[in-house]
Amino acid sequence: MLQNSFIQLPGVGLKKERSLWKTGVLTWKDFLHQNEQSKYQASKNKLSLDIETCNNRLFEEDATYFYNILPPSESWRLFKEFQDACLYLDIETNGGDYYSGFITTIATYDGNNIKYYVNGENLDDFINDVFDSKILVTYNGKSFDIPFIENYFNVKLNHAQIDLRHTLKSLGYGGGLKSCEKQLGLSRDGLEGVDGYFAIHLWNEYYYNANQNALETLLAYNI
């Protein structure tokens, strides 16, 4: 989708982008090779230079560049070209805020493997691993997960981000992640009734009572 996008270019909004598509200009290559059209002639040279820059940055696999120039609501357009560089992540906490709370578990998926990070075991390994990816895919991560991680580990994550909360909302799906899953017909066998509050209880049950089953349920919920 990224190579079909023009909305990241200066002076191009959704309306102008759609107008380009309607004229048959569907890709960057189409634009660079199109016949001169009076409607865009004045700006064609400048836009062509901008598109050449996009081509170069895509060749360099610079996801952050595109993340910074795309409108925030359009970051999903990064996915097709950078899907192999995505890391899907979700965190669970003890229920406290950024300053009094702490991360209990983190679950990640890189397209091939699921990994779990547990407080008191291997949580610090997450910071080493997260920088192997270019894009972080979350649900409400821009508002919660990423700031919490940055504050907890005292680190800055400069990754490009795709926050599915905003993408799903634009498609008519609202509520929390688990609510969206239900609306999309996705089920979690054995996890009915488990929510963020119960996840805190599961952590406490594991931490204070060494209940391994509680941890396994928490990790299943986390992913």
Region annotations inferred by a language model:
Residues 105-190, 195:
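Conserved DEDDh/DEDDy metal-dependent 3′-5′ exonuclease domain
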Residues 84-94, 222:
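Two-metal-ion RNase H-like nuclease active-site motif
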Residues 10-11, 87, 160:
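Short conserved micro-motifs on helix faces and helix-strand junctions that flank
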Residues 74-79, 92-97, 125-126:
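Catalytic micro-motifs at enzyme active sites that drive phosphoryl/nucleotidyl and oxygen chemistry
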Residues 185-223:
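Acidic, Mg2+-coordinating catalytic module of metal-dependent nucleases/exonucleases
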Residues 1-83:
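N-terminal accessory regions of nucleic-acid-interacting proteins
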Residues 98-104:
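Short, flexible loop/turn motifs enriched in small residues
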